[in-house]
């Protein structure tokens, strides 16, 4: 149910992850978050890092903030997006050197960066029935939300995406394994929503990527919809669903950005309030797909590129928003990033100014539409050495 963004036009938020401060050099390494917070050094580093990430988003003028996915370890290529939950689930023992089909599907081989990234991932092996472990999403959200008065969006990988980083040696088929994962994640998301988290983002349903595969059928995609919606049953927060075309080590998985065309009708059947799409990387090529779409969902478009270290000019961001408004009403448009910033590839400064560009570009369009603008604290000339 739309709550936080219900009455907001052109609300702004990043996807989730953000580069760590260099001094935050601790990792959970599979430990319980609550147990780690009993260590004075970890508690101080973690809390200060989350505060720094939130402060940067507030200084940039974002309406909604995140904790930067600061629970994730110092790991290769954003590995913890998968492995923060996998390291804490019961039923997984050991690992293998490759993920199922991923390397061959994308033509990876030694000498390519994503080959090394995937080698570092070490997918787990399911030996017993999967069971819930100490994911502690509620505790993570509470620590972050008490550092800000702005609504804090908490994001986590979806169950079907988790399954892609597992070798199944227990279940009769992968579908049964996926449904068990969905039930585990549903319990976690319900607890998080019941604690008061206003926005829960469930990340990377496989529909748009699977739709590209040779032999992929509508029945396959319909099962993914059933599974994805199963993990959202009874979750009372505003639900965002994030989609993109990949972000391992801040790299493109597809050199030529694919289209959402086949996957979009299936994505629109997900039980969410806000659907995000990668848009900056393709210069909004898929926006005309929304011309004839009738939906109550809000659509969040990425207006800055996570795979590019060049900060987009505000006018460039504004132009993409104007293009989106040709197909999506302003009441249903949300402004975001293509994907997260915290996958080894971007510095904090670059990530910060991409946030600033996002908000300043949105402010240009807000002025044109007569909407209230957000204050971008860092853009106030009075606060700089050479200011007036």
Segments (PLM) and residue ranges:
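Domain-level signal for soluble alpha/beta catalytic cores
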Residues: 1-388
């Amino acid at each position: 149910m739309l709550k936080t963004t219900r009455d907001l036009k052109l609300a702004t938020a990043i996807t989730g992850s953000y580069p760590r401060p260099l001094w935050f050099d601790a990792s959970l390494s599979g430990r319980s978050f609550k147990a780690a917070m009993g260590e004075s050094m970890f508690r101080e580093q973690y809390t200060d890092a989350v505060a720094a990430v939130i402060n940067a988003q507030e200084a940039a003028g974002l309406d909604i903030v995140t904790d930067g996915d600061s629970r994730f370890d110092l790991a290769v290529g954003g590995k913890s997006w998968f492995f923060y939950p996998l390291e804490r689930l019961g039923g997984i023992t050991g690992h293998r050197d490759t993920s199922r089909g991923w390397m061959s599907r994308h033509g990876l081989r030694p000498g390519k960066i994503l080959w090394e990234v995937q080698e570092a991932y070490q997918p787990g092996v399911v030996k017993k029935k999967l069971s819930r472990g100490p994911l502690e999403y509620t505790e993570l959200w509470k620590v972050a939300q008490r550092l800000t008065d702005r609504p804090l969006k908490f994001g986590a990988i979806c169950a079907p995406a988790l399954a892609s980083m597992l070798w199944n040696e227990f279940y009769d088929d992968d579908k049964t394994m996926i449904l068990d994962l969905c039930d585990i994640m549903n319990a976690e998301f319900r607890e998080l929503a019941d604690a008061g988290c206003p926005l829960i983002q469930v990340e990377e349903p496989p529909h748009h990527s699977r739709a590209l595969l040779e032999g992929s059928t509508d029945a396959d995609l319909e099962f993914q919809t059933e599974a994805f919606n199963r993990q959202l049953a009874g979750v009372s927060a505003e639900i965002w669903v994030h989609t993109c075309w990949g972000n391992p080590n801040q790299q493109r998985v597809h050199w030529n950005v694919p289209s959402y065309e086949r996957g979009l009708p299936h994505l629109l059947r997900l039980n969410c309030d806000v659907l995000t799409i990668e848009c900056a990387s393709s210069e909004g090529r898929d926006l005309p797909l929304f011309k004839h779409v009738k939906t109550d969902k809000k659509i969040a478009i990425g207006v800055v590129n996570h795979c590019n270290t060049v900060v987009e000019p505000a006018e460039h961001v504004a132009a993409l928003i104007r293009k989106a408004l040709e197909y999506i009403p302003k009441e249903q448009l949300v402004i975001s990033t293509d994907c997260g910033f915290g996958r080894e590839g971007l510095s904090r400064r670059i990530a910060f100014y991409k946030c600033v560009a996002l908000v300043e570009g949105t402010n240009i369009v807000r002025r044109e539409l007569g909407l209230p603008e957000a204050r971008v604290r860092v853009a106030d000339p009075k606060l700089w050495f050479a200011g007036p």
